From Swiss-Prot:
<comment type="function">
    <text>Regulates the biosynthesis of dolichol phosphate-mannose. Regulatory subunit of the dolichol-phosphate mannose (DPM) synthase complex; essential for the ER localization and stable expression of DPM1. Part of the glycosylphosphatidylinositol-N-acetylglucosaminyltransferase (GPI-GnT) complex that catalyzes the transfer of N-acetylglucosamine from UDP-N-acetylglucosamine to phosphatidylinositol and participates in the first step of GPI biosynthesis. May act by regulating the GPI-GNT complex.</text>
</comment>
<comment type="similarity">
    <text>Belongs to the DPM2 family.</text>
</comment>
<dbReference type="GO" id="GO:0000506">
    <property type="term" value="C:glycosylphosphatidylinositol-N-acetylglucosaminyltransferase (GPI-GnT) complex"/>
</dbReference>
<dbReference type="GO" id="GO:0033185">
    <property type="term" value="C:dolichol-phosphate-mannose synthase complex"/>
</dbReference>
<dbReference type="InterPro" id="IPR009914">
    <property type="entry name" value="DPM2"/>
</dbReference>
<dbReference type="GO" id="GO:0030234">
    <property type="term" value="F:enzyme regulator activity"/>
</dbReference>
<keyword id="KW-0472">Membrane</keyword>
<feature type="transmembrane region" description="Helical">
    <location>
        <begin position="49"/>
        <end position="69"/>
    </location>
</feature>
<keyword id="KW-0256">Endoplasmic reticulum</keyword>
<dbReference type="GO" id="GO:0006486">
    <property type="term" value="P:protein glycosylation"/>
</dbReference>
<dbReference type="GO" id="GO:0180047">
    <property type="term" value="P:dolichol phosphate mannose biosynthetic process"/>
</dbReference>
<keyword id="KW-0812">Transmembrane</keyword>
<comment type="pathway">
    <text>Protein modification; protein glycosylation.</text>
</comment>
<dbReference type="GO" id="GO:0006506">
    <property type="term" value="P:GPI anchor biosynthetic process"/>
</dbReference>
<comment type="subunit">
    <text>Component of the dolichol-phosphate mannose (DPM) synthase complex composed of DPM1, DPM2 and DPM3; in the complex interacts directly with DPM3. Component of the glycosylphosphatidylinositol-N-acetylglucosaminyltransferase (GPI-GnT) complex composed at least by PIGA, PIGC, PIGH, PIGP, PIGQ, PIGY and DPM2. Interacts with PIGA, PIGC and PIGQ.</text>
</comment>
<dbReference type="Pfam" id="PF07297">
    <property type="entry name" value="DPM2"/>
</dbReference>
<feature type="transmembrane region" description="Helical">
    <location>
        <begin position="11"/>
        <end position="31"/>
    </location>
</feature>
Length: 84
């Protein structure tokens, strides 16, 4: 069973994910249909960032996954050389 701290951290992660999802969905799907002079537009970044932010995040994720795989492979290779 999860401890109280685990539950709080899990709830926090779910809450942050829901906030980001709601913000991004509103930004990308609903905002284009609202008049550009409406006051709600000042709470959102320009639309170009709607593509750039997920793209940069995806590239960083791929970079870290690649670095992790490289690290594990090099570490495994060193251990097999020591064993021989």
């Amino acid at each position: 069973m999860a401890t109280g701290t685990d539950q709080v951290v899990g709830f926090g992660l779910v809450a942050v994910s829901l906030i980001i999802f709601t913000y991004y969905t509103t930004w990308v799907i609903l905002l284009p249909f609202i008049d550009s002079q409406h006051v709600i537009h000042k709470y959102f970044l320009p639309r170009a960032y709607a593509v750039l932010i997920p793209l940069a995040t995806g590239l960083l994720l791929l970079l870290f996954v690649g670095l992790f795989i490289t690290y594990v492979m090099l570490k495994s290779r060193r251990l097999t050389k020591k064993a021989q």
